């Protein structure tokens, strides 16, 4: 059953209501008419601003957010006690499930990356990445880990050094264990958690043409049921978890910024300063979110990565450089040596509260944070292969994090043991939020480095806020990415308002505990996502391994002389030649096939896209993807093999095919009419086998490209 668009026109106190069919399944659209000023409204009543939302998800998530914020405002202490108790009970009672789940996530992602599934594209077979590799890495890094690295770079290694889980405190063994544990908490396990959600959303969103929402990962289990109540609940859960994570991180981060400004400039640590900081950060994030991923988020992420590298290199150069590089190599060895043991070590035979306070807390936090980071990574990863996605997401940020933690953590331990005589360890224990600034006091130019650190923390918060708001907006709109600016402003502002309200009432800790508690049910959802990925990819491989999936078969069957084929390959047709070919050869061939199919009781039609000029033969199929054989003009850069090549046109225009199942297209420029018909028939035979095969039925029955 389709949803409807609700259009409301407000004129004075009256309102007129109308409805029309909406063609996008599972999505409700609301049209708001925004009044202009009195002077502007002469001759024009209103300016239309369209809000695109999935109504049950939008209303449900806003209601749940309001409920939890209300509890935090009305009874912050009572709420903190209840949610903290819930968090403690979950971590102690189900910690084994967290460890086991994260192990499954990691090994599943590695298997998908390095098996035959790794060759699948996140999108059609010939899709290309939307962002440069460096921009892509910068954005996923800033969204996934950024602010935590600033907060824990000095604090966590120093804390484990002073109070390690097993070694004697403040010893060489404690140094080794401190860095090994820190690497473990910030290494590939965290990114494996993010990868599960990100890969699931990207794969089913771009490969199965489903909405870019968490519910789509449940498609192999629920099929069309993802558009019903269960799907709504999953998306509401994801929105609320993301909003609460954003709000608590923003609130605690503002406290750190305020501490830094107090440490540097003597600015008082007060609620008024903190509310002002929330306003400034939210305003900058709003500007960024309005400009979108391609501009605001990308530019801020790249700037942040550049400044972070600059700060890290400064500490590396002025610190014990040679020692740090040796430490880096040793730390990686310690990490790899203990990787499997720590993955499954819950201290079952010698219970330690340390595991609940650190490892299990981290796993729960990464899981609760994964809808946000996973969705954002999915949104920017179209066109990547599964192998490229997993290896980049797992290893590139982790390796940078390892170097970062070594530079700051080992330098801090070195300073504490050789210069500060234990003073830095005591300062960190007293106040973790100013540990980084106190660390800079032992290095040259502390004012400059501390100022840069405050700037980095601020930008990290902006990038988290704007990317998080984009993610929430995408889920609330049913997977729509091209939403109105006002809609994105709403979500970005709401995260700032929630943080400000809870800062004022002292409810941040309660909300953080509630957020971490949600990791338990969501870990079960994530296990289903892993299963869904294997089921979906198995159906996909059945399609790609069917005959004809790799290219055209008309040439070998048509007896074209090899000399002519070589001449066609080396030719460089211009735009006019391709347009003429489409009109004179492709169109008659497609029309001939359509007539014959219709005569044989298989209705078919040929259409032309008004904007691109693409020609499409479509054969409808009830309950399956339609058969589509399309041909469109595409432009390709030519390599120069000789000096002569460099003097002629460096662009080649092709008549390239495309298909409804996302198979890779190919150039048919120069084929005769009967050769084109042979190619269409071959692809139709392949399509028939595709929709009839039980192995590929899941993909064959998924929606058409949106």
Swiss-Prot record:
Pfam families, per the entry: BCCT
Annotated compartments: Cell inner membrane
Role of this protein: High-affinity Na(+)-coupled glycine betaine and proline betaine transport. Required for a rapid adaptation to osmotic stress. Does not transport other trimethylammonium or related molecules, such as choline, carnitine and ectoine.
Coiled coil found in the keyword field: no
Effect of disrupting the coding gene: Inactivation results in loss of protection by both glycine betaine and proline betaine after an osmotic upshock.
PANTHER family (alphabetical): HIGH-AFFINITY CHOLINE TRANSPORT PROTEIN, HIGH-AFFINITY CHOLINE TRANSPORT PROTEIN-RELATED
Main localization, broad class: membrane
UniProt similarity note: Belongs to the BCCT transporter (TC 2.A.15) family.
Gene source species: Rhizobium meliloti
GO molecular function term, any single one: transmembrane transporter activity
Membrane topology classification: Multi-pass membrane protein
Protein name per its UniProtKB record: Glycine betaine/proline betaine transporter BetS
Superkingdom classification of source: Bacteria
Keyword Cell membrane among UniProt keywords: yes
GO CC terms: plasma membrane
Regulation: Uptake is stimulated by high osmolarity. Stimulation is probably due to conformational changes.
Induction and repression of expression: Constitutively expressed.
Listed NCBIfam families: bcct
Membrane-spanning segments: 55-75, 94-114, 134-154, 181-201, 236-256, 271-291, 305-325, 358-378, 389-409, 442-462, 489-509, 516-536
Gene Ontology biological process terms in this record: amino acid transport; sodium ion transport
UniProtKB keywords: Amino-acid transport, Cell inner membrane, Cell membrane, Ion transport, Membrane, Plasmid, Sodium, Sodium transport, Stress response, Transmembrane, Transmembrane helix, Transport
Cytoplasmic topological segments: 1-54, 115-133, 202-235, 292-304, 379-388, 463-488, 537-706
Spans within the Periplasmic topological domain: 76-93, 155-180, 257-270, 326-357, 410-441, 510-515
């Amino acid at each position: 059953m389709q949803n409807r668009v609700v259009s409301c026109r407000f004129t004075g106190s009256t309102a007129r209501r109308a409805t029309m069919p909406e063609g996008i399944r599972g999505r409700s659209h609301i049209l708001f008419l925004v009044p202009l000023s009195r002077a502007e409204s002469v001759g024009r009543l209103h300016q239309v601003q369209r809000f695109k939302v999935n109504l049950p998800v939008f209303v449900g998530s806003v209601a749940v957010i309001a409920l939890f914020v209300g509890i935090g405002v009305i009874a912050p202490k009572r709420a903190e006690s209840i949610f903290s108790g819930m968090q403690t009970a979950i971590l102690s009672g189900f910690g084994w499930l967290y460890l086991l789940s994260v192990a499954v996530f990691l090994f599943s992602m590695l298997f998908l990356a390095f098996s035959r599934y790794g060759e699948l594209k996140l999108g059609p077979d010939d899709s290309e990445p939307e962002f440069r590799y460096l921009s892509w890495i910068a954005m996923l890094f800033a969204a996934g880990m950024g602010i935590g690295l600033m907060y824990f770079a000095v604090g966590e290694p120093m804390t484990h050094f002073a109070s390690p889980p097993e070694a004697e405190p403040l010893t060489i063994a404690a140094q080794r264990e401190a860095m090994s544990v820190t690497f473990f908490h910030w290494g590939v396990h965290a990114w494996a958690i993010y990868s599960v959600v990100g890969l699931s959303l990207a794969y089913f969103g771009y490969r199965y043409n489903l909405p870019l929402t968490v519910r789509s990962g449940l498609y192999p289990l629920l099929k069309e049921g993802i558009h019903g109540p269960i799907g709504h609940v999953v998306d509401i859960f994801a929105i609320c978890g993301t909003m609460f994570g954003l709000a608590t991180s923003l609130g605690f981060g503002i406290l750190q910024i305020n501490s830094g400004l107090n440490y540097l400039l003597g600015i008082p640590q007060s609620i008024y300063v903190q509310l002002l900081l929330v306003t400034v950060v939210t305003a900058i994030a709003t500007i960024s979110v309005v400009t979108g991923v391609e501009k605001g988020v990308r530019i801020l992420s790249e700037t942040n990565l550049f400044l972070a590298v600059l700060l890290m290199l400064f500490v590396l150069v002025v610190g014990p450089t040679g020692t740090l590089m040796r430490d880096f190599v040793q730390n990686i060895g310690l990490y790899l040596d203990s990787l499997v043991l720590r993955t499954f070590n819950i201290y079952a035979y010698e219970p330690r509260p340390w595991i609940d306070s650190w490892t299990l807390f981290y796993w729960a936090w990464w899981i609760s944070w994964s809808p946000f980071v996973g969705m954002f990574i999915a949104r920017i990863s179209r066109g990547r292969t599964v192998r490229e996605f997993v290896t980049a997401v797992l290893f590139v940020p982790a390796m940078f994090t390892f170097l970062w933690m070594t530079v700051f953590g080992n330098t801090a331990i070195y300073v504490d043991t050789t210069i500060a005589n234990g003073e830095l360890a005591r300062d960190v224990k007293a106040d973790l939020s100013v540990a980084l600034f106190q660390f800079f006091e032992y290095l040259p130019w502390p004012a400059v480095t501390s100022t840069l650190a405050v700037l980095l923390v601020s930008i990290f918060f902006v990038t988290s806020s704007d990317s998080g708001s984009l993610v929430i907006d995408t889920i609330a709109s049913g997977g729509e990415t091209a939403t109105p600016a006002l809609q994105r402003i709403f979500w970005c502002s709401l995260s700032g308002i929630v943080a400000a309200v809870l800062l004022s009432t002292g409810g941040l800790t309660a909300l953080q505990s509630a957020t971490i508690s949600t990791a338990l049910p969501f870990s079960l959802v994530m296990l289903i996502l892993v299963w869904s990925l294997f089921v979906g990819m198995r159906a996909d491989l059945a399609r790609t391994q069917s005959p004809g999936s790799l290219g055209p078969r008309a040439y070998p069957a048509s007896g074209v002389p090899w000399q002519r084929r070589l001449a066609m390959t080396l030719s460089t047709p211009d735009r006019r030649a391709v347009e003429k070919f489409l009109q004179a050869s492709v169109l008659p061939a497609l029309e001939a096939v359509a007539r014959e199919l219709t005569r044989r009781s298989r209705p078919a039609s040929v259409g032309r896209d008004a904007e691109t000029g693409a020609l499409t033969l479509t054969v409808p199929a009830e309950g399956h993807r339609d058969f589509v054989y399309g041909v469109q003009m595409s432009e390709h850069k030519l390599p120069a093999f000789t000096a002569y090549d460099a003097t002629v046109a460096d662009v080649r225009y092709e008549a390239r095919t495309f298909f409804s199942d996302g198979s890779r297209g190919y150039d048919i420029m120069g084929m005769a009419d009967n050769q084109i018909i042979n190619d269409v028939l071959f692809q139709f035979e392949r399509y028939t086998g595709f929709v009839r095969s039980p192995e590929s039925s899941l993909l064959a029955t998924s929606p058409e490209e949106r």
